[in-house]
Structures are given as C-alpha cells and as structure tokens.
Amino acid sequence: MDRARTETGELNRFFNWAYRTRGNTVKALAEGKMMSPEKMFLSFTSHDPVFISNGPEGLNGSVKGIGFIPKDEYLEEALAAYVEHIKSYDPEDKTYSDRGLKLLIKWLYSEEAEKTIDFEHIYSVEMAFKHSYANYKANPEATLLFYQPPMLSFEVRGKMEIIGEHHEIGTADPFSLPLIQQFINAQHDVYHLPNIERWVSRPAYKFTVEEIFDNSANKIGFGTKIPF
C-alpha cells in the first residue's frame, strides 16, 4: 500500500491537506469560482512551508513554494504536454493561464491523476542560492514546517537532494537538464509567465519524506507522529 495512505486507502491527514488544498484551489480557479482573498491566502499555506536547513550558512529557515509531481513512469508524457502548452505562449493570449490550470488538473489533481502521484517526495526549485542552497549542498538533513492559522501545523522531516546545477542563462540547453529539473520548472511555467531558457538557472529540490508530525494545536496534534 502507498505509505501516504491509511489502512482505509485514504490519504493521511498531512497529504490530504497539503495535496488537496492546493488541488481544490486550482480546480476553483479553473472553474471561474470566486474566492475571497482570505481563503486564497490561507490555501497558499499548503504550498509555502518553511525549509529548515543547517550547514555552513548556519541554522536557517526559508519560505519556498512546493509541489507534488507524477511518478517517474509518467513524467515524460506529462512534460511533453507541459512543453507543448508553454511553447504556445503569446503575450496577447489571455487564455494561457486558464489552459495551464486545466493541464494541472489533468496531470496532478484529477481523480485519475491522484493515483499516479509520487507521495514519497516533495519538490521545489531554488531561486535565491543563498543560505538554504549552501546548507543543503553540505548537509541534506531537512525539515519542512507548514502552518495554517489559527492552529493547523505539520512538521515533515527528511533528506534534501539537489537535482541539476545552477547555470547562467544561455550557457546550457534547457532540454539537456535532468528530467526532474525540467519537469519542476515546466510545472511552474504552465501557469505563470513562462521562460524555458531560465530553467537552466534553477535546480530542483527533491525532498524525501521520512517522518511526519502533526504539530497542530488540537487533540490529535502537539507533535503526534503520523504513520508513514
């Protein structure tokens, strides 16, 4: 059985929150539903944990965006769909982001897509190349800390792997990068302003989940370990 799921087959409470909160927001946007700013901002807490690291730059915490991706055997097909969409970008085309949302639903957040998701890992891209980057190059131990006011909080411990290198734009072929580095950057660009040439400057983070704790201020939290 998938370690992210309980004995009933349901996602455990961390993944149910982290994956489905983001997915529900994407679906709502794709359907044109209005979301209050407060609800929108709260939904981002499942996407923007604090990355905790410790190394030559000292004990550090940095807020970064995260995401889930399909398992290895589905990546090439999904990447091809992403790239086809990205290459269709036209500054005058106001439908680009809406079409991107539909792609994200197809490959990440549909009922069928959920069966293909890699819940063993959490992914991100590096854009700053300061404290976190230096620390993870020296020491892969990492904790991701999530907090949604007023009381929900999860602590996820594991190991961080840096996929790819930080190249100057124009010095490397984006399509020669490691598959995961291409995919994470493409997944970002499916909705946001795309720039394929920029991918070479943004290595990916692959965080292997080892332990999950519910630190929420409620009767099932306060450091309770979630089976995984």
Go through each PLM region and give its residues.
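Binding-site signature for planar aromatic cofactors or substrates
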Residues: 1-228
